[in-house]
Amino acid sequence: MKFNIFKMKIAVVGATGLVGAKMLEVLAERNFPITELILVASEKSVGKEITYKNNLYKVVSMDEAIALKPQIALFSAGGNTSLDWAPKFAEAGITVIDNSSAWRMDESKKLVVPEINAHLLSKSDKIIANPNCSTIQMVVALNPLHKKYKVKRVVVSTYQSVTGTGVKAVEQLMNERAGIDGEMAYKYKIDLNVIPQIDVFTDNGYTKEEMKMVNETKKIMGDDNIKLTATTVRIPVIGGHSESVNIEFENEFELNEVFELMKSTEGIILEDDVINSIYPMPMHAHNKDAVFVGRIRRDESQDKTLNMWIVSDNLRKGSATNAVQIAEYLLAQNLV
């Protein structure tokens, strides 16, 4: 994206974590126009040095970051940190783009996937919520279909990378594969296993992750009438999240039209050639920004219903890239 305005002072809060590191990587790759970079983390990390574009930057505290007055702060430091600190940044006139779940369902906050609803943003939005990783990739594919055929009901099962849990989960997987004892991020082994629980269980028997997908989808797409049920599963994979998605529409569709929609939608790469065994896989989505869609076919058990397979790198489009794209939009529209 090209910018016709002055460069910006940017803070990355949670710079020492997996998503924070990925945010720095994405900012560099996309040549985000930064005049001053402020790296922020917990008190125990203050003073630590991190490299960005061959320059070393020292991690500073939250209070120091606010005093430096960046125009935008990209937050990826967990929900509690966001609840405590995002309002303080906002009160100082800093626009916060928050990757945690803290503000997503707050009625006064926008929940943004740029390809879908960035047009809703205004200068008064000082805390902007970045959606859940598994929700983002799904709604990017659902949105054009909803516009044309009107989504009635979605059944989604996810196969989610350990990177969604964080550094300790990746270390657990690698240690188990190497036969090394180490700290457990999960209650159970993850190598050679799948765990049908992501986040804690709620009173209705669903996990918080599953309910995030239900509630966030409705908010992002601006339609509370969409019915959705989800089962979210952690698998021993690094590269990204995969989803089996079954979509029932109000209106009839033609498969060739669905293929054309996926081909023409910004942010989607269609990989669907079953004769040559071409379909999305996390090992191919790894370190890419696109949402990959394939295995498109009719549900032969029910009318007006479609099956598809959706894969994306959860640390990029599912987290860091989506946040940076929001920041790019704010700059391009002169909203900061």
Locate predicted features.
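N-terminal Rossmann-like NAD(P) cofactor-binding subdomain of oxidoreductases
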Residues: 2-190, 225-227, 291-292, 296-302, ...
